[in-house]
Amino acid sequence: SWVRLRDRRSGREFRVLSLHLDHISHEARLAQVRAVEEETSQYPAGVPQVLAGDFNSRPSNPVAGVLVGAGWVDAFVEANGEDAEHMSFHRFEGDAYKPKKGTPGRIDYIFLKGTGIRVVSSAFVKDCVGGKYPSDHYFLTADIVIE
């Protein structure tokens, strides 16, 4: 899904895109992210773009690398440093969740691309009410500026 928006004060247009990549097939995720990159690359650099969602891939996976290689900036890493590795999926268990195999990792992202767009901060929100989480993922936020 995507939407093209216009800032009322500046008149500047920008795009916000949301996705949820396949959770089973690595090949499907690669094909999906390549299709998204192909579509988004049709817009000039002067149109800032924000791409957010569940990529079902850790930062070291080639799926994220497709976007980084095409000039997208990982907002969380930009705001928190290259070594920022956090778990974003938790199966409604919060910090008590321990994966059966491997180590926990971040699979949710906010990417930025274009001139005049930058991240100010990015963090995971771990809200729960009465021990119940509204999602099996922590919410990822980013404060961005479009100049």
Regions found by a protein language model. Give the residues of each.
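Short, well-ordered beta-strand elements
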Residues: 15-19, 142
